[in-house]
Amino acid sequence: FINVAGLAIGLAVCMLISLWVFDELGYDRFHQNYRRVFRVYWDESSTEPGSASALTPPPLAAAPKKDFPEVLRSTRFGTWQKRLVSVGDTNITETKYMHADPDFLTMFSFPFVKGDPASALSNPYSVVLTEATAEKYFGREDPMGKTLNVDHAFDVVVTGVLRNVPAGSSLEFDLLSPFEILLKEYIGEKNRDNWGFNSFSTFVMLPEAGAGPGLGRKLADYIKAIEPQETDTLALQPLSAIHLRSRLSHDYNNRGDIKYVWIFGALAVFSVKTAALRKIS
């Protein structure tokens, strides 16, 4: 009986660890285009060996799409500060109010409940909400076309509702508005073409996963051409590598580590083997 119980416990431990391992390995793979989406980052190893940063400047997203035909879509993604969002008597400080370009919703597969991903961010003063956020502000009412006030400064119109962002997503947000709002209301037009203002993520989508290394080399040459004094260079990181294999500074808070996946995976195998040997003996 003891041996059987030991085997059952070993199998249970293995199953629990396996569920966690598969969750970690599955991060960002719910996106239909995850193999073709890459994050552009700064490789700073020329000034500090092994150093790299996830933050890039505002003009970067437009440059590859304009100058490199292999870039099908591109987007910036980020925020600037907490936002006070209001409707009626409801005032809530939002910490996950993010901004992106219109391509974002067709590059990434965040499922829509209402609205059209191809046009939801085309109006500069629009906002897309998750289901939980829509219910928080509007209850059971249809939020489409309704208005939210931001920081007592400007209004945004609800143009889409998404299912809540999956737990296995590196990119997290509750509200999403066009990047243009950041330029117009917060960081200023002066930073639209400021290559030294490294504050946001940049993503590109390519025709195929294998096109990444070639574009990475082109981007390195490109930055040297427009900023001859720049010693750092641009590089690409696959979307699927962000959660477990990223060592960039200024990265997302929900990052994991492939090392622990291997350790716990080995522990799961060991627990089953140990329990099985005890059962046999």
Regions of interest found by a model, annotated:
Residues 9-38, 281:
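Alpha-helical transmembrane segments
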Residues 1-12, 262:
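N-terminal signal-anchor/signal peptide hydrophobic helix marking the start
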Residues 7, 11-14, 269-276:
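Hydrophobic alpha-helical transmembrane segments of multipass integral membrane proteins
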Residues 25-39, 45-55, 61-63, 164, ...:
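Sec-dependent signal peptide cleavage junction
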Residues 1-2, 6, 275-281:
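Intracellular coupling helices
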Residues 251-269:
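N-terminal membrane-entry
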Residues 98-114, 126-256:
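Mid-to-C-terminal secondary-structure elements
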Residues 38-42, 57-113, 226, 232-233, ...:
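Short amphipathic beta-strand/extended segments in non-transmembrane regions
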